[in-house]
Structures are given as structure tokens and as C-alpha cells.
């Protein structure tokens, strides 16, 4: 009986693909070696311990309909579009060894005519006249009896968009999260004009088969029907939830300040697991009562633009004479935390 398993996703949904990955990883036999190939439409994928408000331009992501997805492995933030080919290698211990999966990817690139080398712990690079350029980045996860290595191959990614979403507006965040390292990158199409996702997947698959000396048929995972994977529905619900993608951020503090025609405002937030645990408001407004009331109401509020806006606007019932100021404040706060 074969110990290999090959899965290919037809979905471009990052939450779907990461849920599939998680389910396979949890239920696979310890003797199995798995290759999962997939790709995501416009998404910023952050590491398990990262703060999305620090790593990402969340406002621009919302404007451009770019999703946020938190993965279960560590490492930094990356932007995915359909110009990325994603791979995941899984195996039980003691056989799990990320150098094996790295070798398979390097062999696949070599078969396509690209000579690449491993650089540091996570990257694959090619040598160019301008120096080493990164074509692949990886992250890893291990449990007591198994491990996985997942990563991306930059095929024809829109590299201009990397900076759009991974270089956030300067916010006054004093964060405990891990700041991503920005790397010099290159697309494989610069080296292999016309290369396709399907060709890259085929090359990785053939290198996978060659390493283990076995061939198997691929299982196609489609979003058209719920995958036959244990606990997939629950895992997808968690993976797509605000509580996981945003709420799992490390604790951080945020200072907002603005001057309006009616006075200056400073708001200080302490945030844990996406919830405001402490809020302070300072103002030189002639009527500070609405701001003082707001500080109390914000404690326990989710750190979400819509929730903060609702909380600000709810004060209009108590302070109707300050309706215009409160609406202006609500719009500003919502915009500042997007």
C-alpha cells in the first residue's frame, strides 16, 4: 500500500485552502507523506504570532478586497495572488525532514531549467547580475509526531502589490509581534517566460514521485462540495473567522490623535486578542463629557472599525447636541483602525 498522498486544490480561497491543510495535517497517518498544491487569490497571509494591524495596510486591503489569512505556522507576512504557486509537504516523525522537501522543490526547479539554492532557513534564491533574488519562501510547523513545510513559488506575482499591503501606514503601535523581513524577490517568469502554474505543479509532483520512487493519482479538492475531511466545516469556520485572523494578534497598544475644529483628541488603546482592554480619551474640547463616556464604552469592544464606529455613534442618544462632532469622531476612528 502506498504511503504517498497528492492533493490539488481547485479553490482560490485562502481560508478554504488553509482549512484543508489543517485537516489533512491533523488526521494523516504518521506513516504518510503528503504533497498538497494550491494557490490563493489576493490575500495577505500572516504568521501565527503576528499582528495584522502592524504588518498590513488593513485599510487598503479592505478597499481592494484583499483577504487576511492567519496561518498556523510561524514566520512573516506575505502577499499571495494567482501568480504564486503554494506547496505543502507533510510527514510523520522521525521521517519528517524539511531538507527533503527543500531538495524536492530545488529538483523541480532544476528540471525546469532554473538553478536555485537554499538560503538561510526559509528561502530559495537564484543568482542574477543584481545579486541573489528570492523566488520561494517557506514556513514550518511541528507537533509531537508530525511536521509540515509549506511555502510559495513566485511565478508571475504582481510584485508591485507586495509593497501596497505589506508596508503599512505608520501607526503608533508598540507591538510584541514579529516584524516581517522584506526581501528582494524575483518571478520565475523572468527566468522562464510563459511558465504556468500547472507546469510548476507538474514539476514539483514529478520530483516528489522521483524522490520516493512511487506514483499515485492526485485527489482534487474542490470548493463545489465540502471536502470529505474530518472536522472540515468547523476548521473552515475557525480559519475564516475574525477571531482567528485578527483576534489572535499579540497584545499591543495604539495611540490615535487628531485635531478637529471643535478640539484635539487623543485615544489610547490597549488591545489583547483583538479586544480593547483599556481605553483612555484626552481632549481640549470645551465639552469633554462625550469623550469621557466613550472611553468607558470602548473597554471590552472588539478592535474592529465597524464596532468602534457603532460605539461612537451610540453616544448620540446621550449627547444629541454633539451629534455632528460624534459622527465626525466615529468616521475618523473607524478609518484610523482599518
From Swiss-Prot:
Does the keyword section mention Mitochondrion?
no
Please give the organism: Salmonella typhi
Name recorded for this polypeptide? Lipoate-protein ligase A
Domain (BPL/LPL catalytic) ranges? 29-216
Gene Ontology CC terms = cytosol
Q: What else is known?
A: In the transfer reaction, the free carboxyl group of lipoic acid is attached via an amide linkage to the epsilon-amino group of a specific lysine residue of lipoyl domains of lipoate-dependent enzymes.
Which annotated residues bind (R)-lipoate? 134
User: What family name appears in the similarity comment?
Assistant: Belongs to the LplA family.
Amino acid at each position: 500500500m502506498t504511503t504517498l498522498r497528492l492533493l490539488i486544490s481547485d479553490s482560490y480561497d485562502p481560508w478554504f485552502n488553509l482549512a484543508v491543510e489543517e485537516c489533512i495535517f491533523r488526521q494523516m497517518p504518521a506513516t504518510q507523506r503528503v504533497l498538497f498544491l494550491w494557490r490563493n487569490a489576493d490575500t495577505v497571509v500572516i504568521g501565527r504570532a503576528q499582528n495584522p494591524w502592524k504588518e498590513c495596510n488593513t485599510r487598503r486591503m479592505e478597499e481592494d478586497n484583499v483577504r487576511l489569512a492567519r496561518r498556523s505556522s510561524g514566520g512573516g507576512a506575505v502577499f499571495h495572488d494567482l501568480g504564486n504557486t503554494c506547496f505543502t509537504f507533510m510527514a510523520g516523525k522521525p521521517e519528517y525532514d524539511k531538507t527533503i522537501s527543500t531538495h524536492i522543490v530545488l529538483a523541480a526547479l532544476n528540471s525546469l531549467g532554473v538553478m536555485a539554492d537554499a538560503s538561510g532557513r526559509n528561502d530559495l534564491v537564484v543568482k542574477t547580475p543584481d545579486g541573489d533574488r528570492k523566488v520561494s519562501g517557506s514556513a514550518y510547523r511541528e507537533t509531537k509526531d508530525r511536521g509540515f513545510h509549506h511555502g510559495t513559488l513566485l511565478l508571475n506575482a504582481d510584485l508591485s502589490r507586495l509593497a501596497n499591503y505589506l508596508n503599512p501606514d505608520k501607526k503608533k503601535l508598540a507591538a510584541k509581534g514579529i516584524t516581517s523581513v522584506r526581501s528582494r524577490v524575483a518571478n520565475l517568469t523572468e527566468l522562464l517566460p510563459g511558465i504556468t502554474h500547472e507546469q510548476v505543479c507538474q514539476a514539483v509532483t514529478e520530483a516528489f514521485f522521483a524522490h520516493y520512487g512511487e506514483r499515485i493519482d492526485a485527489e482534487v479538492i474542490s470548493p463545489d462540495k465540502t471536502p470529505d475531511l474530518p472536522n472540515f466545516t468547523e476548521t473552515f469556520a475557525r480559519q475564516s473567522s475574525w477571531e482567528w485572523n485578527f483576534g489572535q494578534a499579540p497584545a499591543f497598544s495604539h495611540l490615535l490623535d487628531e485635531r478637529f475644529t471643535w478640539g484635539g483628541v487623543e485615544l489610547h488603546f490597549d488591545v489583547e486578542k483583538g479586544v480593547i482592554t483599556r481605553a483612555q480619551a484626552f481632549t481640549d474640547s470645551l465639552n469633554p463629557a462625550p469623550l469621557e463616556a466613550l472611553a468607558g464604552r470602548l473597554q471590552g469592544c472588539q478592535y474592529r472599525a465597524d464596532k468602534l464606529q457603532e460605539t461612537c455613534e451610540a453616544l448620540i442618544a446621550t449627547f444629541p447636541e454633539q451629534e455632528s462632532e460624534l459622527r465626525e469622531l466615529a468616521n475618523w476612528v473607524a478609518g484610523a483602525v482599518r
